[in-house]
Amino acid sequence: MAENVTIARPYADAAFELARGAGALGPWSEALDRLAAVAADSSMRACINDPKLSADQLNTLVQEVGGNLTAEQQNFVRVLVDNERLQVLPEIRDLFVALKNEHEGVLEAEIASAFPLDDAALAALKADLEARFQARLNVTVSIDPELIGGVRIAVGDEVIDASVRGKLANMAAALKN
């Protein structure tokens, strides 16, 4: 995985600079989402690794399956095909999104809850977190019954554990000391 990220970084940087310069961060993000899904598909991975397919055939296949691409995006796919880097498209997409979020002042937040959160509770929690981190947040919510109650929030490298399980673990550690 780390090797793929290293390989993907210059491609993500180039795509980001091209998209930012054209004022097309949104369309590029959408195109990379589609292309990453194509590259992650098991049948497409078999095609990518098939030595019988020429670069032109693979390029045509990816562009047809990848949806409506601009000329710059088609050239980007061609560069990836020519350099045998299609397999790192998911990492390119992830790095591109991170660069886009940094540029737009957006942080990724993962909220794990013991129970489903209603819209009002989620909106209030998101507003509190945005005030605390002084940034807009892209929130991903998951359900983790092992938390027993409460929530565990991860924003960047900071984790806020307000779960019953976390509090019990802290109490157990305090009793051992």
From Swiss-Prot:
Membrane topology note: Peripheral membrane protein
Membrane-spanning parts: none
Keyword terms: ATP synthesis, Cell inner membrane, Cell membrane, CF(1), Hydrogen ion transport, Ion transport, Membrane, Transport
This protein's record includes keyword Ubl conjugation: no
Keyword set includes Cell membrane: yes
One Pfam family per UniProt: OSCP
Annotated GO CC locations: plasma membrane; proton-transporting ATP synthase complex
Gene Ontology MF: a single term: proton-transporting ATP synthase activity, rotational mechanism
Superkingdom: Bacteria
Cellular localization per UniProt: Cell inner membrane
InterPro entries: ATP_synth_OSCP/delta_N_sf (IPR026015), ATPase_OSCP/dsu (IPR000711)
Family label: Belongs to the ATPase delta chain family.
Subunit structure: F-type ATPases have 2 components, F(1) - the catalytic core - and F(0) - the membrane proton channel. F(1) has five subunits: alpha(3), beta(3), gamma(1), delta(1), epsilon(1). F(0) has three main subunits: a(1), b(2) and c(10-14). The alpha and beta chains form an alternating ring which encloses part of the gamma chain. F(1) is attached to F(0) by a central stalk formed by the gamma and epsilon chains, while a peripheral stalk is formed by the delta and b chains.
NCBIfam families hit by this protein: ATP_synt_delta (TIGR01145), PRK05758.2-2 (NF004402)
PANTHER family in alphabetical order: ATP SYNTHASE DELTA CHAIN
General function of this protein: F(1)F(0) ATP synthase produces ATP from ADP in the presence of a proton or sodium gradient. F-type ATPases consist of two structural domains, F(1) containing the extramembraneous catalytic core and F(0) containing the membrane proton channel, linked together by a central stalk and a peripheral stalk. During catalysis, ATP synthesis in the catalytic domain of F(1) is coupled via a rotary mechanism of the central stalk subunits to proton translocation. This protein is part of the stalk that links CF(0) to CF(1). It either transmits conformational changes from CF(0) to CF(1) or is implicated in proton conduction.
Identification of the protein by name: ATP synthase subunit delta
Organism phylogeny: Bacteria, Pseudomonadati, Pseudomonadota, Betaproteobacteria, Rhodocyclales
